[in-house]
């Protein structure tokens, strides 16, 4: 699903840029981790333990890095990016530095008021990705923010009234929310939102509690089959590629042996301007000293950023991106 800001004639332009970046082995997607600070308390992530003093080291602009890489897709993430009061300035600087781009923001949504959403939209955000792993109180518990789910759903009408027309839920597939995946998709469809799935991994802090063990793989296969069937009948809601959804059970069964291409099509730039190939890897160099990455023999995760980078660019993938959910 795309914002109404984008028209069908943008497709060949984006495909041309995608081809150019791929041939040149330049990143198609750059994640700007604008802060490692976070006010959530997720059990599977330790970013919330980042000292408040880290704020002093955060870059005041990512525009030069954006101009250097000239990616097709840009994501502002963290930590919790909306903690930065100057986030609009950061977004506007990057938006002005790159031609032909698609800019997204990943947030837990707890501080995304309609007014703030409109301000970020005007600065250049094209899509808001709000984390949502459960439809009940488990979401509040998992994120450590009381009332978070109600706050997110309560703000959606106001955000849409501000003219923001592109909201997705980012849902992590975990052992204890397999029963929630299809209901989340249906709720998103009712709200005119999209859903993007990513498989849980313990590589952030070693928490294995949410890993899907081998005896749960048949259930995982059943759920992903249901998601694929829904996707075939309702284009524009689930925004993952068929390839990614089909490959998730294979990864869970330990059947994925291909090297990871993180760092080739996607990179992460931390709050100080240093580059890492993966969000769970240490940094390698400052962006001004960037060196091209090679595939790495790592099977620690099957995040969407890895799986989607391996998905073939077919016509069906273009339809996935262009289609919009029907209210």
Roles of regions detected by a PLM:
Residues 2-127, 327:
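Conserved alpha-helical substructure of the radical SAM core
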Residues 23, 28-33, 243-249, 267, ...:
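Short, intrinsically disordered, charge-biased short linear motifs at domain edges
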Residues 33, 131-133, 200, 278-281:
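Generic beta-structure capping elements
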Residues 40, 137, 276:
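Glycine-centered loop/turn positions within well-structured domains
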Residues 54, 118-262, 271:
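Radical SAM enzyme [4Fe-4S]-AdoMet core and its adjacent flexible, acidic
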Residues 84, 112-114, 178-181, 276:
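Short, well-ordered alpha-helical microsegments
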Residues 254-261, 268, 272-327:
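Flexible mid-to-C-terminal extensions adjoining Fe-S/redox cofactors in radical SAM and related proteins
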């Amino acid at each position: 699903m795309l914002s109404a800001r984008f028209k069908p004639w943008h497709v060949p332009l984006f495909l041309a840029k995608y081809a150019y970046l791929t041939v040149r082995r330049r990143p198609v997607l750059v994640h700007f981790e604008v802060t490692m600070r976070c006010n959530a308390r997720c059990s599977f992530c330790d970013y919330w333990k980042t000292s408040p003093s880290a704020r002093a080291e955060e870059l005041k602009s990512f525009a030069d890095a954006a101009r250097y890489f000239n990616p097709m897709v840009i994501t502002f993430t963290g930590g919790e990016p909306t903690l930065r009061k100057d986030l609009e300035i950061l977004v506007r600087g990057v938006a002005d530095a790159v031609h032909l781009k698609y800019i997204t923001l990943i947030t837990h949504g707890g501080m995304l008021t309609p007014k703030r959403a409109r301000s970020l939209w005007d600065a250049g955000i094209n899509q808001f990705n709000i984390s949502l792993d459960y439809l009940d109180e488990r979401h509040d518990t998992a994120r450590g923010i009381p009332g978070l789910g109600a706050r997110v759903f309560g703000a959606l009408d106001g955000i849409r009234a501000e003219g923001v027309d592109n909201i997705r839920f980012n849902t992590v597939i975990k052992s204890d929310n397999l029963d929630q995946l299809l209901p989340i998709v249906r709720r998103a469809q009712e709200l005119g939102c999209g859903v993007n799935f990513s498989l849980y991994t313990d590589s952030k802090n070693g928490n294995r509690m949410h890993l899907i063990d081998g005896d749960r793989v048949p259930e995982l296969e059943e759920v992903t089959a249901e998601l694929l069937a829904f996707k075939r009948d309702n284009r524009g809601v689930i925004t993952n590629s068929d390839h990614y959804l089909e490959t998730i059970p294979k990864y869970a069964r330990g059947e994925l042996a291909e090297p990871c291409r993180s760092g080739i099509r996607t990179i992460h730039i931390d709050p100080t301007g240093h580059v890492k190939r993966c969000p769970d890897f240490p940094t390698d160099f400052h962006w001004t000293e960037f060196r091209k990455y090679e595939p790495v023999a790592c099977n620690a995760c099957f995040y969407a950023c890895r799986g989607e980078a391996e998905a073939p660019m077919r016509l069906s993938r273009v339809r996935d991106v262009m289609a919009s959910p029907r209210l």
